[in-house]
UniProtKB/Swiss-Prot annotation:
One of its GO terms (biological process) is unsaturated fatty acid biosynthetic process. The gene is fabA. Its EC number is 4.2.1.59, 5.3.3.14. Belongs to the thioester dehydratase family. FabA subfamily. NCBIfam families: fabA, PRK05174.1. This is 3-hydroxydecanoyl-[acyl-carrier-protein] dehydratase. It is found in: Cytoplasm. PANTHER family: 3-HYDROXYACYL-[ACYL-CARRIER-PROTEIN] DEHYDRATASE, 3-HYDROXYDECANOYL-[ACYL-CARRIER-PROTEIN] DEHYDRATASE.
Length: 171
């Protein structure tokens, strides 16, 4: 298992193919749905709650796929993609901890949007504070997160929940 404290784009893509933490670990999406270019830091003892943190980044450029279709003449990154990135990172954290199975978003307590990601932005930064992880019959991670664009916080989410399941056929 790879317990590194940072990951580059190639390693994140490898996670999507089951080649970073192993073939049975939770996977990140690949291609357009992978909403980060790097994980700058990941640990299991930092953050606001002392139970772990993740900081990840997405480089923004006007050629990103979503700017062409959301919206015509008013391009903006869909807020749901930033939220999905937060869930992706909670699932990644569980795989980094050694969980096996398929990751699924289970919910979120509250989401607030107070700004937007436009094509002229340079960088999105995701900052997650792990609140709790459970590794029993139920494997689940819970985190609070913010999204910053060029250093300005524009999204926040509390109680992001991701579960890892050995069987999703009845989910």
């Amino acid at each position: 298992m790879n317990k590194a404290n940072s990951f580059n784009k190639e390693e994140l893509i490898a996670c999507g193919h089951g080649k970073l933490f192993g073939p049975n670990s939770p996977r990140l999406p690949v291609d357009n749905m992978l909403m980060m270019d790097r994980i700058v830091t990941i640990n299991d003892n930092g953050g606001e709650f002392g139970k772990g943190e993740i900081v990840a980044e997405l480089d923004i450029n006007p050629d990103l796929w979503f700017f062409d279709c959301h919206f015509i003449t008013d391009p903006v990154m869909p807020g749901c993609l930033g939220l999905d990135a937060m869930w992706q990172l909670v699932g990644f954290y569980l795989g980094w901890e050694g969980a096996e199975g398929k990751g699924r978003a289970l919910g979120v307590g509250e989401v607030k949007f107070t700004g937007q990601v436009l094509p002229g932005a340079k960088k999105v930064t995701y900052k997650l504070n792990i609140k709790r992880t459970i590794h029993r019959k139920l494997v689940m991670g819970i985190a609070d997160a913010i999204l910053e664009v060029d250093g300005r916080q524009i999204y926040s989410a509390t109680d992001l929940k991701v579960g890892v399941f050995s069987d999703t056929s009845t989910f």
